Amino acid sequence: MLSIDKHLPAPHGLAAVLVRRAPKLVLPFLARSRSRLRATLDDGREVAVVLPRGTVMRGGDVLVAEDGTLVEVQAAPEQVLRVTSDSRLALMRAAYHLGNRHTPVQVVADALQLEADPVLEDMLVRLGVTVTHVQAPFEPEAGAYGGGHRHGHDATFEEDYAAAQALYREHHGHSHDRGCDHSHSHSHDHDHDHGHVHGPGCGHAPHHRHD
């Protein structure tokens, strides 16, 4: 069994012919995100990988065994969700909700890709984007998986969705500016109150009452 303890992220500067001739370690993203594992190379040899904790192997990276053997990492095709939309705004909103859940996401041309998950798929459909199942290598953005891998299996989507809708209405419907056409009241429990916050163009005389 080969023991591997060195990881060379791409671009590693090794001669292309050496990498091309090297045996391949073909793994899905979940396995490539483990720093310790046993696996089988494409030539049938067994390997034990022991890398620094937190290491994520990417397609094109090279591993070096204790005996000097080079091994090229390849991202295995796996079941992923591909998210597309004719509306750039809808796709941006989908990316926001996925990021809010710390979901690993791969950004490709005009699409997002993520690990297959029925709950997240339902959320995305409700957001109005198109979701298709494809077999493809999965290479999420670096750091997207930091802080844990959390799916939307909770009630936070309803709150996030409402907040996103409210934000959209605020920017595309009614908005407040410095001219303050109407008043806002703010009550306080301390000894004085401010009935209105005055700004340029307000048109109201200042009033500040002390008891």
UniProtKB/Swiss-Prot annotation:
Annotated region described as Disordered, given as residue ranges: 170-211
Entry GO terms, CC: cytoplasm
Keywords, alphabetical: Chaperone, Cytoplasm, Nickel, Nickel insertion
Cell compartment(s), UniProt: Cytoplasm
UniProt feature, compositional bias: Basic and acidic residues: 176-196
CDD domains: UreE
Any Gene Ontology biological process: protein-containing complex assembly
Protein task: Involved in urease metallocenter assembly. Binds nickel. Probably functions as a nickel donor during metallocenter assembly.
Protein name in the entry: Urease accessory protein UreE
Source organism of the structure: Ralstonia nicotianae (strain ATCC BAA-1114 / GMI1000)
Taxonomic placement: Bacteria, Pseudomonadati, Pseudomonadota, Betaproteobacteria, Burkholderiales
